């Protein structure tokens, strides 16, 4: 076992503070509309320029092991806030640094760390309750655009695009962010249900210009097994051909004789048909086939349910107004399923999302939900250079997460003012002793820090003066760092999602409390590389003197 180095009490906390400060001081320069960029060196390719707190935090690794522990604890604040709310990572870092700094002063003066922690926890609970109290719900396109604009570092183009995307696909719709081929940033909306499976043969194409199979007023056969034998497929083919409507076949696979027969009949004009593989794998495939069946009013022909392909009737087939199939994707528009069944399926998937513990599963469930409830919006991000593209794409993703958070829990006034207004909630925090009262006061002081930092980043105004002026005001009155004016911030579009502000404070207090109650740090003793024996001359043994 490797020998360990142990550092105790004041020495340990002082070193942890150095690490906390190194990370926080690097991250907090990005806060607010006047925040600066941070340039990050990459081993390969061009450096990355970013104004995203969590991106900066994730890049910081310190040489000293205990300092690095402090830095990594605060990095956890940024990461957790990003995971939960998608934004507010810099605010969380600033709050964590302030709580730890003020707490350390009191521990050094003889306060009991565990009572400080209890006071901090009680204070945070009351502040969160006050934030919820002053929160207001959002629904309009204009309010959604405001949240997106602020989270994208005051880029109104991005705010408008996100608002338009949400307007098109709904609150539960999937909005994906991709890199555009050109310089233009644009929104593309895919109506209906799209899945990533294209036609099994180019001979199914009906439009040779676009290389797509276009089926109008189509029937849909949904089967969860492979189809290789024409005999089992023939009865349902004959029944659908009699109706004169085109047919889309979705199955695990279609091969051999069955595929060849379909292609020949399609070329002769006997059948209007197209065949695609079923989307997904395993249990997810079964669920997606069921989604398609409900959306189109059809039935999944599955032997597990007692249905056989050779006995299938036209009643088992789904229906859609239009289906478009290219070499990569199938899009079903205006499925003829009943609204009651579709709503029931949507609620079922929402329930699964609430119970899901895996980020991957949640993402896939949300995709399925969107395909059932309104479609998919794609934001194609354009820029002049790759460096600008990556930076802009990161901002769009942040703004998208923040906007979703705002829809969930509402918004509060931005610019650090909501935390100032929430200070009045501390009057409800009860302390059992002086040290707990000190813990409450630590939060009181820390809540001012984001506003101080936003002002400091403007480089032109005194933070203490601004803080006093904002405290004297009420409601939405605050300092707009972009225009350097005192005004009604909500009217000026300076708002934050309540979830972002709440998560930032909760996560910051949690990690700062852990650091305050730390009494010892254990690290590996670093090996001294200079003590390593030198390689003997003449190369490696058995290599004949080769290097």
UniProtKB/Swiss-Prot annotation:
GO terms for cellular component: cytoplasm. Residues 528-547 are annotated as: Disordered. GO terms for molecular function: ATP binding; ATP-dependent protein folding chaperone; isomerase activity; unfolded protein binding. Residues 538-547 have a biased composition (Gly residues). Its main location: cytoplasm. It holds the Pfam family Cpn60_TCP1. PROSITE patterns: CHAPERONINS_CPN60. Keywords: ATP-binding, Chaperone, Cytoplasm, Isomerase, Nucleotide-binding. ATP binds at residues 30-33, 51, 87-91, 415, 496. It is found in: Cytoplasm. InterPro entries: Chaperonin_Cpn60_CS, Cpn60/GroEL, Cpn60/GroEL/TCP-1, GroEL-like_apical_dom_sf, GROEL-like_equatorial_sf, TCP-1-like_intermed_sf. One of its GO terms (biological process) is protein refolding. Belongs to the chaperonin (HSP60) family. Together with its co-chaperonin GroES, plays an essential role in assisting protein folding. The GroEL-GroES system forms a nano-cage that allows encapsulation of the non-native substrate proteins and provides a physical environment optimized to promote and accelerate protein folding. PANTHER family: 60 KDA HEAT SHOCK PROTEIN, MITOCHONDRIAL. Forms a cylinder of 14 subunits composed of two heptameric rings stacked back-to-back. Interacts with the co-chaperonin GroES. This is Chaperonin GroEL. It comes from Chlorobium luteolum (strain DSM 273 / BCRC 81028 / 2530). The gene is groEL.
